[in-house]
């Protein structure tokens, strides 16, 4: 069976502990990627990646590796776009999936909001992380793992 790997854009990710538990339950490997040092549990399925300095070093590291049997967890919309184009499943920490159908509009709205904030016409950012977001994320991650496993099994037999 093809191995599924989870790539976690770890800087400011509020669901890392949940990712570790789901990965252990499903026997899925996890790459926790950050620009610098980040603490991760000592577990054979979990690896820490310090992608190095640079504003997009962690994003580039993930985008260069993510593929069809991988799941990327990120709130970074440009990174999500790159990974969706590479065929990876992408889930935001609030459980929202980024798909081929949704990523174009999501990226356009993100760019518009960035421009509005830069011009001073709008302030603020996304709403705060809620307990229901954690639940939605866990459900979305379980579904993505099961979907990829079914697709791999169908291709093999």
Swiss-Prot record:
InterPro entries: UPF0178. Belongs to the UPF0178 family. This is UPF0178 protein Nwi_2152. Pfam families: DUF188. The lineage of its organism: Bacteria, Pseudomonadati, Pseudomonadota, Alphaproteobacteria, Hyphomicrobiales. CDD domains: PIN_YqxD-like.
């Amino acid at each position: 069976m093809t191995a599924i790997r989870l790539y976690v854009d770890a800087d400011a990710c509020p669901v890392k502990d949940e990712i570790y538990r789901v990965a252990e339950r499903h026997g899925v490997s996890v790459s926790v990627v950050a620009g610098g040092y980040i603490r991760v549990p000592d577990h054979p399925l979990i690896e820490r990646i310090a992608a190095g300095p640079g504003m997009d070093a962690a994003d580039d590291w993930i985008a260069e590796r993510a593929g069809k049997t991988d799941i990327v967890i990120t709130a970074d919309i440009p990174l999500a776009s790159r990974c969706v184009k590479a065929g990876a499943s992408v889930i935001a920490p609030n459980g929202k999936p980024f798909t081929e159908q949704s990523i174009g509009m999501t990226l356009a709205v993100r760019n518009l909001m960035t421009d509005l904030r830069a011009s001073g016409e709008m302030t603020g950012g996304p709403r705060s992380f809620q307990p229901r977001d954690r639940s939605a994320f866990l459900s979305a991650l379980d579904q993505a793992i099961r979907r990829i496993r079914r697709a791999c099994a169908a291709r093999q037999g």
